[in-house]
Amino acid sequence: MSDLQKGMALLISTFHKYSGKEGDKCTLTKGELKDLLTKELGGAFGNCSDQATLDKIFKDLDTNADGVVDFQEYATMVACTTMLCNKSLSKK
């Protein structure tokens, strides 16, 4: 398996590690998203213990406004975060 394939598999397995604990196994609830952001991305999303911050992040990610974050919305978040990290690291 190539490095890129391993990265894709990790992206998928990380999503499913947190999804389905509170509801549908193919989506993330707000609580599941909070756990994922806190445990997997640390400070990259600021203070996720602040409810207003979490609500804003969730609203921005839930682009179809169905009350959950699906895999496509999650993958978009990871891709955008990766682009921001790349941009920051490229400046150094």
From Swiss-Prot:
Ca(2+) 1 binds at residues 27, 32. Pfam families: EF-hand_1 (PF00036), S_100 (PF01023). One of its GO terms (molecular function) is calcium-dependent protein binding. SUPFAM superfamilies: EF-hand. Ca(2+) 2 binds at residues 62, 64, 66, 73. InterPro entries: EF-hand-dom_pair (IPR011992), EF_Hand_1_Ca_BS (IPR018247), EF_hand_dom (IPR002048), S-100_dom (IPR034325), S100/CaBP7/8-like_CS (IPR001751), S100_Ca-bd_sub (IPR013787). Residues 12-47, 49-84 form the EF-hand domain. Plays an important role in catfish calcium homeostasis. This is Ictacalcin. It comes from Ictalurus punctatus (Channel catfish). The lineage of its organism: Eukaryota, Metazoa, Chordata, Craniata, Vertebrata.
